[in-house]
């Protein structure tokens, strides 16, 4: 499993850099490319990719210190990304020496001893380096950027816009584990009944005041592996996405134009508010994302929405008059 996860992570990070793909898109492409579809390997690879990307500025800084007088850019894409992953695995995941050795062996198996031999010296240095001392050695804005895992240009922009005190609060909050929210899907059944089914699967929820069917997850297992999720009893949805549909407030008689609609959180929420009556025209320019949208509409029992493959920057192939237009770019995973 570890070898497959390392192979997926190396290749996915490379696609992200080459074609500016998202974590999810690059992993989906790599899984198909390498024919690796094991759920455990994919889950492990996804965690590596997300955390390595989130901490990339610090990882690259430390890697370049370790590799000095050379740098990451002196090596192939595969070697560069394995060094990044090894740094995450050993310094941020806090692996023990046996786990670090197993990870290194997996990298050698994926890339080959010949490719990694020029940087073998770096792996021992990585184990002994103190990341905090590297961060303390940076100056001013660069130190703050490293300490909070943000790019310097973003830190500088926020300070100009918000001032230093508010920027510090923002940067620190960005590193907190985000709250998970779900929407109970009343297109499937009564809210009270659906809540009881989730409780049977060990999910603990806290309602949000003044907002119908939206709950904060207090305790959870893997939500997407639950039978209630597969049957469409609930949808995992960011709170800001929920507020879009609530603000639009569509009625059962409305025709809604949902632009940038995939993967479908807002579409399905509006269909729920409309009680599966009326009409939703769902526009997206990505055929791949519309396939995901269709899958979600089936899972969530949405019957009133029509997918339209089109670019909203061009004239749309429509003659209908919409009562409500929902435009919320950039949308999920853009």
Range-by-range predicted roles:
Residues 1-334:
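S-adenosylmethionine
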């Amino acid at each position: 499993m570890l070898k497959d996860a390392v192979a997926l992570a190396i290749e996915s990070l490379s696609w992200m850099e080459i074609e500016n793909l998202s974590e999810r898109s690059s992993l989906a492409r790599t899984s198909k490319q390498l024919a690796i579809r094991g759920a455990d390997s994919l889950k492990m690879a996804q965690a590596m990719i997300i955390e390595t990307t989130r901490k990339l500025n610090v990882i690259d800084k430390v890697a370049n210190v370790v590799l000095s007088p050379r740098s990451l850019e002196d090596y192939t894409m595969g070697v560069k990304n394995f060094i990044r992953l090894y740094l995450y695995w050993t310094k941020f995941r806090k692996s023990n020496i046996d786990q670090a050795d197993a990870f290194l062996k997996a990298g050698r198996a994926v890339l080959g001893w010949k490719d990694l031999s020029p940087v073998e010296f770096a792996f021992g240095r990585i184990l002994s380096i103190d990341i905090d001392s590297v961060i303390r050695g940076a100056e001013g804005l660069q130190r703050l950027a490293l300490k909070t895992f943000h790019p310097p240009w973003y830190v500088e922009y926020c300070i100009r816009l918000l001032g230093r005190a508010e920027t510090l609060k923002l940067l620190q909050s960005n590193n907190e584990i985000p709250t998970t929210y779900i929407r109970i899907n009343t297109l499937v059944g009564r809210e009270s009944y659906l809540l009881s089914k989730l409780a049977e699967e060990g999910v603990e929820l806290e309602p949000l005041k003044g907002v119908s069917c939206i709950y904060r997850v207090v305790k959870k297992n893997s939500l997407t592996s639950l039978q209630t999720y597969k049957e469409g009893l609930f949808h995992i949805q960011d709170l800001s996405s929920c507020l879009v549909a609530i603000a639009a407030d569509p009625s059962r008689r409305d025709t809604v134009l949902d632009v940038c609609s995939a993967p479908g959180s807002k579409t399905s929420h509006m269909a729920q508010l409309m009680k599966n009556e009326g009409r939703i025209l769902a526009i997206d320019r990505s055929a791949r994302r519309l396939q995901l949208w269709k899958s979600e509409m089936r899972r969530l029992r949405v019957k009133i929405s029509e997918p339209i493959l089109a670019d909203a920057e061009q004239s749309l192939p429509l003659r209908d008059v919409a009562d409500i237009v929902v435009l919320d770019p950039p949308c999920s995973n853009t």
